[in-house]
Amino acid sequence: MLKILKYSFYDLMRSRWSYVYFLFYLLLGIVLLFLNNDLSKAVITLMNVIIILVPLIGTIFGVMYYYNSREFTELLLAQPIKRSSIFLGQYFGVATSLAMSLIIGLGLPFVFYGIFNSSAIWDFSLLLVTGAFLTFIFTALAFVIALSNENRIKGFGYAILLWLFMAVIYDGIFLMSLLYFEDYPLDKFSLVATMLNPVDLSRVLILLKLDISALLGYTGAVFQKFFGTNFGLILSSIMLVLWVVIPTFFIWRIAKKKDF
C-alpha cells in the first residue's frame, strides 16, 4: 500500500492542478496579509474560504483521480496485490498531496509574516488542522462515491451533490429546524446536528477558538458551553477522526467486494 500511496502522491504532485491549488492558497495568503495587518482577521477570512473550498476541491480531485486512473488501476488489479491496498493507497496519496498543498501554500506567507511571534499562531494552526481533516474526509467520501458508481457522469453528479448538501443545504435545513421548533429545548439537537456535519463542526471549532461565538447568538452560547470545555474539544476531535475512519472503512469494504 505504501508504494501505491507514494506513486499516487508523486503523480498528483506533478500534476499542474496541484500547482494551481498550491499557488492559489499562496497568493490568497499573500493578498490577505497585504490588505489586512491583523492576523486574526486574516484567519477569519481564510476560514470562510477554506470551509467551502477545501471540501469542494477534495471531492472533485478524489473523483477525478479515480476515474482518470481507472486503466492503471485495472492493470494493478491483475497483479498479486490486495484490492484494498490499491484503493487505500490511492486515497491516502491524493488526500496527503492536497493537504500538503493547502498547508504549505497558506503556511509560507504567514511564516514569513511572523505568525510564530503572534498570538494568532494557535488559531492559524487549528485552521490548517481542520482544513487537512476536511481534505481527508471529502476525498474519502469522493472515493466511496466513485467506487460505487462506474458511470463517470453519475459519480461526478453525486459527488457535487454531496458537497452542496454538506456545505449549503444542511445549514438551511438546520436553521429551518431551529426556527420551526424554537419553542422546544434544542440544545442537544444543535450539538448533535453540528457534529453530524464535518463542515459545520470545523466552522464552530474555529469560531470558538477565535472567541467570536457571540456572532452565533444563543446557539453560540450553547456551543461555547460544550465545545469550549476539554471534553467538548476531545469529543469534537474524535468526531472528525471518525469522519475520516468511517469513509475509509467503506473504501476498504467496497474495494474488497466489488466485481471489477
Residue ranges and their predicted role:
Residues 255-260:
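Short cytosolic juxtamembrane segments of multi-pass membrane proteins
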Residues 30-50, 93-158:
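Secretory targeting signals
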Residues 22-26, 156-165:
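Central hydrophobic cores of alpha-helical transmembrane segments
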Residues 65-96:
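Helix-loop-helix units of permease transmembrane domains in multi-pass membrane transporters
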Residues 1-20:
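Aromatic- and glycine-rich beta-strand/loop motifs that create alpha-glucan
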Residues 169-245, 249-253:
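Terminal transmembrane helical anchor/hairpin motif
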Residues 46-69, 91:
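Long, hydrophobic alpha-helical segments
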Residues 1-3, 38-46, 67-78, 100-109, ...:
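Hydrophobic alpha-helical transmembrane segments
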